[in-house]
Amino acid sequence: QLVSRIQRPMLDAARLLPIFVNSMTSCERLMELEKLPMEEDVSPITLKGNIGIRFSDVSYSYSEKGRAVIHHFTHDFKPGSFTAILGSTGAGKTTLIRLILSLITPTEGKGEAYTSEGTIALSPALRNNFSYIPQGNTLFSGSIRDNLLLGNPHATSNDMRQALHIAMADFVFDLPNGLDTRCAEQGGGLSEGQAQRIAIARAILHPCKVLLLDEATSALDIETEKMLLKNIKQHFQDSTIIFVTH
């Protein structure tokens, strides 16, 4: 009996340790966010016509004395083009996406968007023209319908069905509750591949002229990925697509 009295508190403490570590990690991340400079609130600018993205001699480093992640990069992502960006981890692929979204600004050089009507420097005001699918699982706690409506609050059930079909996510309609199926934070209850396809469907629902996919198909098998990219090309025929992969 004495042994059990000693063991029980120790076991309880051992169970609490992972929770404590996770909590501390979360606190550290929140503290990092607090240190970030506040972004100025700007009115969105909607560009008319097909959009191209052009970088001229762009370099970027995450610190003043650090190695340049992107070094004198020049490229023109022409309107309506489909571009695959390949490279190993740390090669600067995600950094390029962040530059397009103006989450960071070039250390050197310039980035700009252009249409047949003119050219404008990349800025936070242009983000409404883009649809972005980041790495990892980006679903939120709630129903599949709730997650899809984040892409377009006015989407109908038919719109969602079409987007899910394009994203190779017809499996949703085989689930007992269909669109009203609940998923936990980060798509809990779904496989990673299923969660990725729902995230892609959400991006498809968002009207955009530029689609950015940052390793958004990493959990899919090759055949499913091929079919998905084929569907995306057909659906976004007039949009500029930038696809980041390994």
Give the residues covered by each predicted segment.
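Cytosolic ends of transmembrane helices, especially the final helix of ABC transmembrane type-1 domains
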Residues: 5-33
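Conserved NTP-handling cores and scaffolds of large molecular machines
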Residues: 10, 37-38, 137, 152
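Pre-NBD coupling/linker segments of ABC/ABC-like ATPases
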Residues: 38-48
